[in-house]
């Protein structure tokens, strides 16, 4: 399969710059992958497509305010530091990306402050890639105080394609209501559509709500740089699947109930046949890393349905959706979505493939 097959024209005005007023009021396109039938409803109506003991798998990662704007200590030059992951909480050491990279070298000190007078100084201690650096924050106070100040200084890492300033609303809306375990720098966007009320309605209907953790990284928005998809290697992400969750999902499979992956981060994680899932489609508890990359054609052995968004051309998420629903069908329904003016991107509308 070639990357260029996933190119299509997306009118700029269909990229949602802001979320819908209410989480569960977005539009929902329902796609029956066996027949190709398409229905158009509101997201909160998704409950009508599931029955008692059908099982949802959510990603409970929490997005950190990863984008810091500061200055070089001596020159005052503006810099941006993007937090990727914490390496050593005791030493306050992080793996980061910096911009402008050519002007930020080992030994440089960076200064960050905000309108609330939160301040912190950091020192570059190593290089990792052309833009990658290892940074140590120079803070001697309690760890919780450090994290509070750091996150107060940071902005939510909304994707660059939104091409707008971060707002206070993003702090809440670029986060699922069930976010629990911090570590992501990309929101599990399919989950953004779930409200507290909708989650409660699913529980009352008898659906099983299960949670895994996938700390989604910048690789989700990194451009695929090869035409031959077999040559592409995705970035690794840290995942956690506990025993309780694995047991519930395996029971659903054994009882032939629907298993719905909420988002592509969940979908690819539970298809990791090296670490997570057996050849029969049963999950093992696992804590570690995965770099599973999925594109058509692919035989899924765990999920029976998928909730996802409308993704941008040539994106890794689009490849996964096309693998799940079938390439021809998904590219056709994307044409229908554009004609019907569905909203694309992380704050856009949703799709259910069943």
Swiss-Prot record:
Specify the domain of life of the species encoding this protein: Bacteria
Q: What keywords tag this UniProt record?
A: Cytoplasm, Queuosine biosynthesis, S-adenosyl-L-methionine, Transferase
Supply one GO molecular-function term: S-adenosylmethionine:tRNA ribosyltransferase-isomerase activity
Q: What's its catalytic activity?
A: 7-aminomethyl-7-carbaguanosine(34) in tRNA + S-adenosyl-L-methionine = epoxyqueuosine(34) in tRNA + adenine + L-methionine + 2 H(+)
GO biological process per UniProt: queuosine biosynthetic process; tRNA wobble guanine modification
From the UniProt record, give the pathway where this protein acts: tRNA modification; tRNA-queuosine biosynthesis
User: Where in the cell does this protein reside?
Assistant: Cytoplasm
**A single GO cellular-component term on record:** cytoplasm
Q: Any idea of its EC number?
A: 2.4.99.17
Instruction: Show the InterPro entries listed in the entry.
Output: QueA, QueA_dom1, QueA_dom2, QueA_sf
Q: What class of enzyme is it?
A: transferase
Matching Pfam families? Queuosine_synth
What family classification does the UniProt entry report for this protein?
Answer: Belongs to the QueA family.
Q: Which HAMAP family match?
A: QueA
Q: Main role?
A: Transfers and isomerizes the ribose moiety from AdoMet to the 7-aminomethyl group of 7-deazaguanine (preQ1-tRNA) to give epoxyqueuosine (oQ-tRNA).
Self-association state and partner proteins as the record states = Monomer.
Provide the protein name: S-adenosylmethionine:tRNA ribosyltransferase-isomerase
Name of the gene this protein is made from: queA
């Amino acid at each position: 399969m070639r990357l260029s097959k996933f190119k299509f024209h997306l009118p700029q005005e269909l990229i949602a710059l802001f979320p819908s007023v209410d989480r569960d009021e977005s539009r929902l396109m329902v796609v029956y992958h066996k027949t190709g039938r398409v229905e158009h409803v509101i997201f909160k109506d998704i409950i009508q497509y599931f029955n008692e003991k059908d099982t949802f798998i959510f990603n409970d990662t929490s997005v950190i305010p990863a984008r810091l704007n500061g200055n070089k200590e001596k020159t005052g030059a503006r810099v941006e530091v993007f937090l990727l992951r914490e390496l050593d909480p005791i030493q306050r050491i992080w793996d980061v990306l910096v911009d402008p990279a050519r002007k930020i070298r080992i030994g440089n000190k960076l200064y960050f402050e905000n309108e609330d007078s939160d301040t912190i100084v950091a020192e570059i201690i190593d290089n990792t890639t052309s833009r990658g650096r290892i940074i140590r924050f120079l803070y001697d106070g309690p760890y919780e105080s450090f994290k509070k100040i750091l996150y107060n200084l940071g902005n939510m890492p909304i994707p660059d394609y939104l091409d707008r300033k971060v707002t206070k609303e993003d702090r809440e809306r670029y986060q699922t209501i069930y976010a629990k375990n911090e570590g992501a720098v990309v929101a599990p966007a399919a989950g953004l559509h779930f409200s507290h009320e909708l989650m409660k309605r699913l529980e009352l209907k008898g659906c099983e709500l299960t949670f895994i953790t996938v700390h989604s990284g910048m690789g989700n928005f990194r451009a695929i740089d090869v035409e031959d998809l077999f040559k592409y290697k995705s970035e690794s992400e840290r995942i956690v699947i506990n025993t309780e969750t694995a047991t519930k999902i395996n029971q659903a499979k054994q009882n032939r109930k629907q298993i719905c992956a909420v988002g592509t981060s969940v979908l690819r994680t539970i298809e990791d046949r090296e670490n997570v899932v057996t050849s029969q489609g049963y999950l093992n508890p696992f804590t570690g890393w995965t770099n599973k990359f999925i594109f058509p054609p692919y035989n899924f052995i765990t999920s029976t349905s998928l909730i996802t968004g409308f993704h941008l051309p040539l994106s890794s998420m689009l490849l996964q959706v096309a693998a799940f629903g079938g390439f021809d069908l998904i590219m056709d329904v994307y044409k229908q979505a554009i004609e019907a003016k569905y909203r694309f991107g992380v704050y856009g509308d949703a799709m259910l493939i069943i």
